[in-house]
């Protein structure tokens, strides 16, 4: 999501009660500061058909987005926020966090210009990865933004244009201009082969990284056929795999169906979604793409303000994509962003909790049935004092006990289905009561 730099009615859905199986533990900010051993052992996440696998066992996960971590780690006075949010996630039983591994030509830029990097910012990303490992959290790292926030494809096009080699000033030329493709490949190789100054491990050899994401929310509206974006995905995914054979890779799609999937077009939120140059099934079907990503933003995607309509859309949207994973793609489906805007008319936190509960319930049912819905990441978690990063989706989880409880319940339920990871054991003992 990231808007800027900081930037059928009456349908009821059955929700399985679980409060009796969970002991809710409230976190105060002061509780977050705990000692964690640095010798946490993590294994690479792999794929076996439609399931994620860790140490040979199915891995269904519960997680969150905190896109801002590298940016905040640059400033010593704000560095504590990274440790706080990662420790909070671990205490909630969460296992995966998605964040940005890019900042192109902007304030605190990682990539100052094509091929020029800020070592101070790179060390901040080193710190984020090292802290995630210490807390037993795996990171999903995104490599560029389709949006202008943190530079994105707009910055790559500007670089090529300023150097007199750009084919067009259109942002979409990022996908077809040989110069921007070359810039991006160089960036990708530099990041993947980076040796962490704290751990001494190259990123491509570090199991702390759950997966790479090519681009956040790609769209290419100048080519509605989808051919331009498809060609870019084919080239870039093959390139990533040539550099890093250890990690999983996804595109970063929102999940919209395109012209190659005519029978699925009615699942899209509105007609415009099939005309933005993306095609969920086509883009995700490549052999170099290990799993598919989907976002869930019914209030931003539809004009219908009715809350029950939004829940109905979420239900249909998620089940359609899980079915795609099971039958068409035969790959895991990861819901990498979901949120409900606080700017909606008549918004209440209770309404948002209900929205999230529907999503988490669908994911739980996917886990107990061994389906392709592999995990979900809420957008977004913050710590106190981050108002400038709070788009209309930000949540400080320990300030909302009901919201906090939803996620801890989900962690406990998933652990009961698949067993707890070694990195979760101590926290889950505190969160989850035993079934009688």
Regions found by a protein language model. Name each.
Residues 33-332, 338-354, 358-363, 367-427, ...:
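Active-site mouth of glycoside hydrolases
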Residues 2-33:
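N-terminal signal-anchor transmembrane helix specifying type II single-pass membrane topology
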């Amino acid at each position: 999501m990231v808007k800027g730099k900081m930037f059928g009615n009456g349908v009821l859905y059955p929700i399985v009660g679980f409060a009796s199986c969970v002991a809710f533990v409230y976190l105060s900010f002061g509780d977050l500061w705990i000692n964690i051993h640095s010798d946490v052992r993590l294994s690479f996440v792999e794929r076996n058909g439609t399931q994620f696998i860790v140490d040979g066992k199915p891995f269904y996960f519960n997680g969150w987005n905190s896109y801002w971590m590298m940016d905040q780690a640059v400033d010593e006075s704000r560095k504590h926020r990274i440790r706080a949010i990662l420790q909070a996630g671990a205490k909630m039983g969460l296992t995966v966090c998605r964040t940005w591994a890019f900042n192109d030509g902007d304030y605190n830029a990682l990539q100052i210009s094509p091929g020029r990097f800020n070592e101070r910012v790179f060390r901040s990303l080193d710190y984020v990865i090292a802290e995630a490992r210490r807390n037993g959290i795996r990171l999903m790292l995104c490599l560029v933004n389709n949006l202008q926030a943190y530079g994105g494809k707009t910055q790559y096009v500007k670089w090529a244009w300023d150097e007199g080699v750009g084919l067009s000033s259109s942002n979409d030329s990022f996908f077809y201009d040989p110069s921007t493709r070359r810039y991006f490949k160089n960036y990708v190789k530099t990041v993947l082969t980076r040796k962490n100054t704290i751990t001494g491990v190259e990123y491509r050899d570090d199991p702390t990284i759950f997966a790479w994401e090519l681009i956040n929310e790609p769209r290419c509206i100048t080519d509605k056929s989808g051919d331009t974006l498809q060609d870019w995905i084919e080239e870039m995914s093959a390139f990533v795999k040539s550099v890093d054979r250890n990690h999983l890779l996804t595109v970063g799609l929102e999940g919209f169906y395109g012209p190659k999937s005519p029978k699925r077009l009615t699942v899209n939120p509105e007609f415009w979604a099939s005309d933005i140059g993306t095609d969920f099934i086509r883009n995700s079907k490549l052999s170099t793409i290990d799993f598919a990503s989907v976002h869930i933003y019914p209030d931003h995607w539809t004009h219908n303000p009715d809350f029950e309509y939004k829940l109905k859309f979420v239900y249909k949207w998620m089940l359609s994509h899980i079915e795609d994973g099971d039958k068409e793609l035969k790959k895991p489906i990861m819901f990498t962003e979901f949120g409900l805007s606080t700017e909606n008319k008549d918004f209440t936190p209770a309404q948002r909790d209900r929205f999230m509960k529907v999503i988490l319930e669908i994911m739980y049912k996917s886990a107990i049935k061994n389906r392709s819905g592999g995990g979900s990441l809420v957008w977004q978690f913050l710590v106190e004092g981050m108002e400038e990063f709070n788009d209309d989706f930000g949540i400080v989880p320990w300030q909302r006990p009901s919201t906090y409880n939803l996620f801890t319940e989900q962690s406990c339920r998933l652990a009961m289905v698949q067993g707890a990871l070694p990195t979760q054991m101590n926290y889950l003992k505190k969160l989850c009561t035993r079934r009688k």
